Amino acid sequence: MSGASSSEQNNNSYETKTPNLRMSEKKCSWASYMTNSPTLIVMIGLPARGKTYVSKKLTRYLNWIGVPTKVFNLGVYRREAVKSYKSYDFFRHDNEEAMKIRKQCALVALEDVKAYLTEENGQIAVFDATNTTRERRDMILNFAEQNSFKVFFVESVCDDPDVIAANILEVKVSSPDYPERNRENVMEDFLKRIECYKVTYRPLDPDNYDKDLSFIKVINVGQRFLVNRVQDYIQSKIVYYLMNIHVQPRTIYLCRHGESEFNLLGKIGGDSGLSVRGKQFAQALRKFLEEQEITDLKVWTSQLKRTIQTAESLGVPYEQWKILNEIDAGVCEEMTYAEIEKRYPEEFALRDQEKYLYRYPGGESYQDLVQRLEPVIMELERQGNVLVISHQAVMRCLLAYFLDKGADELPYLRCPLHTIFKLTPVAYGCKVETIKLNVEAVNTHRDKPTNNFPKNQTPVRMRRNSFTPLSSSNTIRRPRNYSVGSRPLKPLSPLRAQDMQEGAD
């Protein structure tokens, strides 16, 4: 462990008693935001084409990588305006009264979009509606131009009757539009609703009318894509993400390595091997997988000894990913929490104050880890059945993506040793099963502290990382108050909680 040099201490007279662990850090080149102006993502497509599925999944991904994003589903606004849905007649293009109501709902939703992007620190809004007419899309473009929003269209095109029928039965039967209705009646009414939309549907025209717009067409659930005039970095990320996801049934298994020697000693980080109980877990994991009879299962590990030893016992091929390595604790590697608190009391307190943003001196933060793990998420979205054997912090980040957890919850998600999380993607989320393999292990979980700072203790300076925090419904924007080589500003007060949907329109 090395502290700051004497010259560094002399240059920082306000901190002469404690080594400055952070002066050697380089500034990160990432900007504070990933967008240079607010973006409105506009869904397009007939009902039962997966628009809400894409909207929710894309929003979950963007929030996870740190771009505050929110879905505005027009069906929710319509159901607020019209409390009882009677039949497909409401969606006929010659139903003038209904057309007025639907247009008014769209205008109200767009006003909420404006408030979110201009007043609530939002960066991306997803307008989840059919938007099948050129008139509607032109109205949205005019709205965006007036408010200086970028627009990116996502059109979902599907002509496979089996996919459409499956979507109706899986999602629409449970829609608020159809309380207490049987499947046959729902299918009949919804197919007639689709026919109503087909009368006025004008797909995006990349060769003429819409050639200057930015958009992606997703054809038959990802069989083909058409991309047109991508404007910026965030739009390219959206395109890349949409080209990697699929809807085929699969299961993702997440677990930590077996208990390690350092786990027994209470030490963090390092590269120790498995304990006796850790090896027992590896054998129990092998038996579990054999009983499951999982087809074409891929196994991924980190490059650390404890995950590799766990995978070796399975008797199957596995792939090692360096980016699955545990969070880098920097100068605190191979120390216990008690040792960290004694040797670096301010660092210990700072991490308790804001665990997601806190970066170990010479190491990583959870925020850094999310960025590092993005390729893993992309690859998981492309794959079928996968078992990921990783580490506590890594598993928390992966779980936060699949379970749509925010920055406040992520660092405190419970990921006990010798426990498997079975994740099964469903229509608008992810089903989770927790399976304990009945092999004892130490508890490595630390609960969130209730009081970060005693009243008689000087609050520790908050240190913001260089790019946007993982977004959540309680998005908090705090100014940077410490840069390398400059005197910190006055300490921040403890963070307080901020007060901060689906279907066809």
From Swiss-Prot:
Residues 2-248 are annotated as: 6-phosphofructo-2-kinase. Disulfide bonds: none annotated. Residues 1-20, 445-505 are annotated as: Disordered. Residues 249-505 are annotated as: Fructose-2,6-bisphosphatase. The record marks R256, N263, H391 as: Transition state stabilizer. The active site is at D128, C158, H257 (tele-phosphohistidine intermediate), E326 (proton donor/acceptor). The modification Phosphoserine is found at S29, S466, S483, S486, S493. One of its GO terms (cellular component) is cytosol. One of its GO terms (molecular function) is fructose-2,6-bisphosphate 2-phosphatase activity. Its EC number is 2.7.1.105, 3.1.3.46. Residues 450-476 have a biased composition (Polar residues). Phosphorylation by AMPK stimulates activity. Beta-D-fructose 6-phosphate binds at R78, R102, T130, R136, K172, R193, Y197. One of its GO terms (biological process) is lactate metabolic process. Beta-D-fructose 2,6-bisphosphate binds at R256, N263, G269, Y337, R351, K355, Y366, Q392, R396. Phosphorylation results in the activation of the kinase activity. Heart. The modification Phosphothreonine is found at T468, T475. In the C-terminal section; belongs to the phosphoglycerate mutase family. Synthesis and degradation of fructose 2,6-bisphosphate. Homodimer. Forms a heterodimer with PFKFB3. This is 6-phosphofructo-2-kinase/fructose-2,6-bisphosphatase 2. It comes from Homo sapiens. The gene is PFKFB2.
